[in-house]
Structures are given as structure tokens and as C-alpha cells.
Swiss-Prot record:
Residues 1-11 form a propeptide. This is Flagellin B2. The keyword Transferase does not apply. Flagellin is the subunit protein which polymerizes to form the filaments of archaeal flagella. Residues 136-148 have a biased composition (Polar residues). GO terms for biological process: archaeal or bacterial-type flagellum-dependent cell motility. It comes from the Archaea. Keywords: Archaeal flagellum. One of its GO terms (molecular function) is structural molecule activity.
Length: 259
């Protein structure tokens, strides 16, 4: 009825307790290590997310206008478009307030239009523009080799020269620029993104160089009553969406209409 504790028994109990205590310490240490590693990973992810969020704000593009220029020629005329069609689509862009420099040459524009969906990149040089009307001595030409009087070269290159899969960029003087100059910064307060309404996904044409006068008719070119969705994706991934809605009727050839 009485417990007879011996020195050996008490020693065994003490060793067992010590082993349990050591095991508990090891488990606690491992758990602490896991918690520390998890906290470090969460902190790194939070910092990365914060940087991405900052980039999305600091590299966001704002739009100032969306305009279409009504064709001045009938379907069998010089620009191959009917008077119910547009000769040019342009969107004015600036950097959002507080934005860093934004390179439009690294910007992708996703367009869903009457003739499908395409990702467009900036035309930077004559390879991305139709040879028709190309004048290597004109400063209105992207990638020109010599400078001449810009006032005499307005008709050398325009939106109708932009090939499928590309957009062009105009400066504030209305002239196309190379990729190195297509940067929204303190020097370029506003630039204009220009699309060719004849080529996909706005129009039916796939190759500008293959278009001859009279080939395109009212249903072939983006024009009256047509709609398109444009997503401008900056190099950081910030997206600016624009809905283009062409009026049902155009009043005057050559007029600018709000889209």
C-alpha cells in the first residue's frame, strides 16, 4: 500500500522528463523557425506587391481625346476610302499625374474591332510603314535620314501608311516620331497615338502595300456607326481602356469627329 521509491526509479523519471523537455524545446524552435521564414516570405511578397502597385500608378497613361478624321476622298479616290469612312483614328495621351517616364515604344495596345482582335506595337521605321508615299528625306517619315521643310511634307506619310499590327505616334507638331522620341515625360507633355482604320482589326485589309485605289469600300474601313475597344498597356502593365464609338453620320469630309 506504500510506494517504495528508489534512487533508480527516481533517476529514470528524471531522465524521461528531461527527454520530453528537450523534445518540446526542439519542436518550439522548429515552429519558431517556420514562423520566421513565413514572416520573411510574407514581407517580401508585400514589398513586391507594393512595388507593383506603385508602378501601376506611376506608369499609368491618361487619355485626353479620341478623334477620327473623316476621309476627304470617295472610294476610288487617292486614299481608297469612302466618305462614310475614317482616314485616321487618333488618341491623345499623357502620363498620369506624378507618373514616371513612359516609353510608348514598349507599350502594347490591345484592340477589339469590327474585324477581330489584335495586339499592336509601335511602328518604328519604314519597315513598319507602307512604302507608298515614303520619302526618305522627309522629317514626317519615321526613321528619316535627312531633315527638310516639314511644311512641305504633310502628305508624304499619314495614317494610311501604317501597316497592320502597328500604331504610330505623333508629336505635338503633328509629325510621326521614332521610338526613341515616343516617351511621355516632362519634354513631351502630350503625344498622339495614331491608327490606320483600313487595316485589321479596324478594317478588312491585312497589307497596306496591297491596297490600290477603289479596293476599299464603306464596309471595309472603320467608319460611321462602328465601335472598337482599345486597351493601352504601359510597360509596367498599367492598363487604360478607351471605347471608340463612331457617329452614325459624318457631315463634312476632312472633319474631326469625336469617337
Amino acid at each position: 500500500m506504500f510506494t517504495n521509491d528508489t534512487d533508480d526509479g527516481r533517476g529514470q523519471v528524471g531522465i524521461g522528463t528531461l527527454i520530453v523537455f528537450i523534445a518540446m524545446v526542439l519542436v518550439a524552435a522548429i515552429a519558431a523557425g517556420v514562423l520566421i521564414n513565413t514572416a520573411g516570405m510574407l514581407q517580401s511578397q508585400a514589398e513586391a506587391t507594393g512595388e507593383e502597385s506603385t508602378d501601376l500608378v506611376s506608369e499609368r497613361i491618361d487619355t485626353t481625346s479620341a478623334v477620327g478624321t473623316v476621309s476627304t476622298h470617295v472610294a476610288d479616290g487617292e486614299d481608297g476610302a469612302d466618305r462614310g469612312d475614317l482616314a485616321e483614328i487618333s488618341i491623345g495621351v499623357t502620363g498620369a499625374p506624378g507618373a514616371d517616364d513612359i516609353d510608348l515604344n514598349e507599350t502594347i495596345i490591345q484592340v477589339v474591332g469590327p474585324e477581330g482582335q489584335e495586339n499592336l506595337v509601335m511602328a518604328d521605321g519604314s519597315n513598319d510603314m507602307s512604302e507608298a508615299g515614303w520619302d526618305e528625306t522627309s522629317t514626317t517619315d519615321i526613321g528619316s535620314t535627312e531633315s527638310t521643310d516639314q511644311g512641305d511634307t504633310d502628305d508624304d506619310v499619314n495614317a494610311s501608311n501604317i501597316e497592320s499590327g502597328y500604331f504610330a505616334v505623333e508629336n505635338e507638331d503633328g509629325y510621326f516620331v521614332e521610338g526613341s522620341d515616343a516617351v511621355l515625360d516632362d519634354n513631351n507633355g502630350e503625344l498622339t497615338i495614331v491608327f490606320n482604320p483600313k487595316v485589321a482589326p479596324f478594317g478588312e485589309a491585312d497589307d497596306v502595300s496591297g491596297i490600290t485605289p477603289g479596293d476599299l469600300h464603306e464596309d471595309d474601313v472603320f467608319g460611321a456607326g462602328d465601335e472598337a475597344s482599345v486597351d493601352i498597356v504601359s510597360p509596367s502593365g498599367a492598363t487604360t481602356s478607351v471605347e471608340l464609338n463612331s457617329p452614325d453620320l459624318f457631315s463634312e469630309p476632312g472633319e474631326a469627329v469625336r469617337l
